[in-house]
Amino acid sequence: MREIINIHIGQAGIQAGEQVWSLMCAEHGINQDGTRNSTSANGNSDCSVLFSEGSRGKYVPRNLMVDLEPSVVDSVRNSSYKELYHPAQMITGREDAANNFARGHYTVGKDMLDVTVDRLRKIADNCTSLQGFQIFHSVGGGTGSGFASLLVERLSVEFPKKCKLSYTVYPSPQLATSVVEPYNSVLSTHSLLEHNDISVVLDNQAIYDICKQRLKIERANYRNLNHVISQTVSAITCSLRFSGSLNVDMNEYQTNLVPYPRIHFMLSSLAPMISRQENYYHENNVAELTSSVFEADNMMAKCNPRDGKYIASCLMYRGDVVNKEVTDAVKNVKSKANIQFVDWSPCAFKIGVNSQKPTVLPDSEFAQVERSCAMISNNTAISQVFERMNDKFDLLYAKRAYVHHFVSEGMEEGEFAEAREDLAALEKDYTELASNSVNEEDSMLDEGETLN
């Protein structure tokens, strides 16, 4: 048993979590009230990774939902899954973070930190061999940026040897919900750089485009977006939850994908992403799926991987897949001139193969398919996300616009400059890692640059 605790922070994290847990229940044969559905339970599944079993045979998610104000959590308490969640594992405050990192990190959020950590300790004490934590949040809002950063910092102290993998929603190039999103994002990323182990970067614009172009949804809403996120999370964690011929655990993700602690921001992709109506026209063989996950249109963040180089990637196949087909498909990808790899990384691929077919919910736009492929990749093109974010930060900070809102919550103004300099160093790190010269790479490390 290798348990994972899921933490959902703020509106984005909690709403994504609702969809994730609906799908996890369907995959593991668990009803909305937590009872086991013997007819749909899969014999290869280890639901104890994500669920604890109570004394009456009821299964409870190993999760925690936290928000600084109650409305989003209250909607979960009144949802059709209200009996699934343990009431003590839904924590709310009385006032929100008002889209302000400093409120989530220094004032309102700080007051909720101890009760949150105490509850996490109790959940961890109920685990026999805790693998680590999955954290769902957005860095654009105040709670998802400020409180999530504060909690991840504390987890590094309380659980120093446990892997922390976050699904982090970044502001979209064209979609902004708050004028201070660039501040929140830079300040939060500055903290994640030091304290998080793996950050899977998502952005709403990329997922909107997937909904429109791939799933043929003309006007996608957050529920549609969260369906895409939940399918991606399911595919990434499949080998953690089901037995297979080639399985990958959380620590292997970290070992294989993260060459230096700071370089832990990942792209993710999934194939096939097709609507129910189009399912009849797609072959979806292993070679096609493998090629598709390297396409920019299938990436969950707005950047072009062909502008960068792959440092490493994990490919997770599930369903009707033969190992030899996977080997042939990977060889084919390696031979493509438009997919580049850094020459200093000895092994670019980690493979997971699992026989469990993908599951789709009845209200999902996704077609039911026989096989799928998901990829988490470390590609230097992810720096495009940070470049856009930094440019927007600079426009605001040049005028010191809205800075007083943060300073009035106990934050030092110098933290803005410190965080921005750290992000500039991160951009430089990715530029240097894309260098083809091993000698240049060696010299970069000798000079004591920021990759440590």
UniProtKB/Swiss-Prot annotation:
What is one process in the GO biological process aspect for this record? microtubule-based process
Q: Give its E.C. classification number.
A: 3.6.5.-
Q: Which SMART domains match?
A: Tubulin (SM00864), Tubulin_C (SM00865)
* Key words, A-Z: Cytoplasm, Cytoskeleton, GTP-binding, Hydrolase, Magnesium, Metal-binding, Microtubule, Nucleotide-binding
What Gene Ontology terms describe what this protein does at the molecular function level? Answer: GTP binding; hydrolase activity; metal ion binding; structural constituent of cytoskeleton
Residues binding Mg(2+) are E69
From the UniProt record, list the reaction(s) this protein catalyses.
Answer: GTP + H2O = GDP + phosphate + H(+)
**InterPro entries attached to this UniProt entry:** Alpha_tubulin (IPR002452), Beta-tubulin_BS (IPR013838), Tub_FtsZ_C (IPR008280), Tubulin (IPR000217), Tubulin/FtsZ-like_C (IPR037103), Tubulin/FtsZ_2-layer-sand-dom (IPR018316), Tubulin/FtsZ_GTPase_sf (IPR036525), Tubulin_C (IPR023123)
**Family annotation (Pfam families):** Tubulin, Tubulin_C
Family label: Belongs to the tubulin family.
Cite the record's note on assembly. Dimer of alpha and beta chains. A typical microtubule is a hollow water-filled tube with an outer diameter of 25 nm and an inner diameter of 15 nM. Alpha-beta heterodimers associate head-to-tail to form protofilaments running lengthwise along the microtubule wall with the beta-tubulin subunit facing the microtubule plus end conferring a structural polarity. Microtubules usually have 13 protofilaments but different protofilament numbers can be found in some organisms and specialized cells.
Name under which the protein is recorded: Tubulin alpha-6 chain
Organism name = Naegleria pringsheimi (Amoeba)
Q: Which gene encodes it?
A: TUBA6
